[in-house]
Amino acid sequence: MTKYIFVTGGVVSSLGKGITASSIGRLLKNRGLKVTMQKFDPYINIDPGTMNPYQHGEVFVTDDGTEADLDLGHYERLVDVRTSKYSNVTTGKIYQEVLQRERRGDYHGGTVQVIPHVTNMIKEKVMRAAQMTDTDVVISEIGGTVGDMESTPFMEAIRQMRREVGSENVMYVHVTFVPYLRAAKELKSKPTQQSVSMLRSIGIQPNMLVLRSEMPVPQEMKDKISTFTDVPVDYIVESLDAPSLFDVPLSYQEQGVDQKVVDFLHIDSPKPVADMDEWRRMDERAKNLKYKTKITLVGKYVELEDAYISVTDALQHAGYLYNSKIEVEKIQAEDITEDNVAELLKDTQGLIVPGGFGIRGLDGMITSIKYAREHDIPFLGICLGMQMASVEFARNVLHLEDANSAEAEPNCKNNIIDLMADQRDQEKIGGTLRLGLYPAMLKAGTKTRECYDGQEVIQERHRHRYEFYNKYREDFEKAGMTFSGVSPDNHLVEIVEITDKKFFVAAQYHPEFLSRPNRPEGLFKGFIGAASGLQVDKF
């Protein structure tokens, strides 16, 4: 029987529910259990694919092409699982399916209401995730905080789950905030008490409390919280601010969180103890890196940390392999000109230009890529970064001065980057990109092939609607650009590189989405190796 863990949050947002869910998932996975991660987002958008990165942050992409919340990236990297369309559900997606069923007549003329139709759909999504992944445990994070109007249907649905699948198969984990008042020099438990009271008022009794705090929570306070919340004191866990995400699962294990979970849910785990030896080595490496490598990221959304979270994480993962801390300096692409590029990039050891949409900042990207190419600074381009590297090469090596991307200038004579054929008549924006996992054939004797340890075929995740215009391939190759990765039918350019440079590689796909702390993605591994000048130092 599948077990279900629901992670909710109270008091304030951004407490780290996703990190809590991921940490529990990692511990259970390392006990030999199959874990499925899931995120419910209460916004009415169908998915975050068309949302402004400044509002929502990065859009994460799964193997099956789902555009999802960035928390799925945390799940994949921390738990080391693959997520799917069953892993991210929004209010918009729920209502869309309910209304489609109503239009088909599936409700036989009945009045469609939040209860039972919307709540039933939410429960269906939870149980479908279990069925489609054949998992032991589904861990579902409920976005927002208890008391939010938007999350009410989700709270009601997970309340009903306990009755439908049995109390022995459901566990409620509530993440709450214990503020420290510096003036009074004391922690306050009242917000936690009120948050749990609100949760109980809608029929959910939490089985475990995770207390987020910047200071250790004394035992007397835990006893007090237990008295007011009816949560056994042994099931009250503290989650202190940590210097590294690696610390969180280890802290939970020290407090016996995984054992409490398997005891409460009556799980017979294949391993009696979670094997966290490799995790501890990663934690030790991350805290004691010997070297530093400075990387410059030139992008469109640099003001928001979460906009490139998978990219910056992937850079750090590669840094661990070389025992080097990666110091990422982010520069707004619009701020880069021919006059200041030398000053801005003079101290960098590597340049990365990640993905994005729209024409803003393209000239700055092209200028920075040109400087990196001419001064042999290691360069990695991703998606839009690959497209701008192609445009830069056309302008400054092939001397096609009007070369551009059709996204920036649709009627340009030399559109090096053009709209994909199946996108030309597309009127909708959302969910219509080339999305998900696709294969690429790698050319022998290239840096790309070397990055992937000699593999002939790789599978990577994509999110784009523009592609390299094939009529220019011969001219590019004659001028020194190598097409080191292409689709199996040789139609779509996946990777370009200048082989005689220290490292000048750009990919149409998003390599950052498959990077893991203990397994850095190939292009990031090659890029940081070239930028740092270091040898691999395994931990």
From Swiss-Prot:
Residues 294-537 form the Glutamine amidotransferase type-1 domain. CDD domains: CTPS_N, GATase1_CTP_Synthase. The active site is at 383 (nucleophile), 510, 512. CTP binds at residues 13, 148-150, 188-193, 224. Mg(2+) binds at residues 71, 141. GO terms for cellular component: cytosol. Allosterically activated by GTP, when glutamine is the substrate; GTP has no effect on the reaction when ammonia is the substrate. The allosteric effector GTP functions by stabilizing the protein conformation that binds the tetrahedral intermediate(s) formed during glutamine hydrolysis. Inhibited by the product CTP, via allosteric rather than competitive inhibition. One of its GO terms (biological process) is 'de novo' CTP biosynthetic process. GO terms for molecular function: ATP binding; CTP synthase activity; glutaminase activity; identical protein binding; metal ion binding. CTPSs have evolved a hybrid strategy for distinguishing between UTP and CTP. The overlapping regions of the product feedback inhibitory and substrate sites recognize a common feature in both compounds, the triphosphate moiety. To differentiate isosteric substrate and product pyrimidine rings, an additional pocket far from the expected kinase/ligase catalytic site, specifically recognizes the cytosine and ribose portions of the product inhibitor. Homotetramer. This is CTP synthase.
